[in-house]
């Protein structure tokens, strides 16, 4: 995209701030995963941070770093570039979670594959990845979900799973 999507603005807030505010409505504890070179960023400094500690690039480094800090916790993972995400969609994901699976994820309306960046990852799956790197041949959370036992659910509001990928994406119709 050419710019840090977390810092894109939606009205008076960044997408990261909007996502954090939304998660606060549903969760007790929220962490923001960052790369080491983002440590001094003033927007991110407002939040509880998890610094990526693994060689994986992208979201997988953050997911594994979070698991390393709290290895017995399931992790609800949300990308900050989903400005249409709403509380009802997060509640649906949490209500339909099944810890007997490796993860619970929405069926992506774009490609009918598990949506890895609005999903709940169970601790057994993440422990398995850390103890056996063969479980993660790529750095892709989606690939991990596709080779795991995942409860895939259909979002009641599939539009909530849209992300913003282009500088020209129209965010004007989103309520802040």
PLM region descriptions:
Residues 1-138, 143-162, 167-171, 175:
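Nucleotide and nucleotide-moiety/phosphate-recognizing core
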